[in-house]
Amino acid sequence: INSDFSNETVFNHSHSTKPLFYKISGTWGNHEGSLLLWLLVLTLFIFIFLLRTKKQPKNYRILTSLFQQIIIVGFFIFLLSSSNPFNFIYPTPKEGLGLNPILQDPALAIHPPILYLGYVGSSIIFSSSLSATVLKGINKEWATHIKSWVFASWIFLTLGILLGSIWAYYELGWGGFWFWDPVENVSLMPWLALTTLLHCILVLEKRSNLTSWVVI
């Protein structure tokens, strides 16, 4: 991996002597890079969704992809207009500033990707539920199909929260694994919603009940 310090993001968050692991994780150790990672995961998940739903009705697959693409385009416009990770510096600096030492931690390095897998997995569930609602397909069969996405998103979000809590405990010295601040609460709210959805999906699959709650 080359250290191209003509890129503003690389200059601000990397250094030529930094270990390869932290050069890679430094990509999402900032606002611009984290949004780029978000878009990457969004694109990866829609690709996986299309591979896994070949036996699903064509209209459902197309409509879900359309809703998902709207989300992707929205984030892409926001990325380029306000958080462009591809800004250049001229003349090119000889060395970068390096990543914040607090962020150079194995737990925190893998924390954002895992957390994003949970967040972005929820977008697939959202797009799928919109499609199923439009096509009047919120039923037991749909619940069986989408259940794996709900469960996977819940697992990734749980792991992401745990990793973030462990890192905060021994790095920030808060004296505990949890602190009621917006950074942590913003991941707790989707986790609670996914936990509720998981229970509702199981009820819908087995008893054909709670259809409205699943959509909400």
Q: How should these model regions be labeled?
A:
Residues I1-I216:
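Polytopic transmembrane helical bundles with strong interfacial aromatic enrichment
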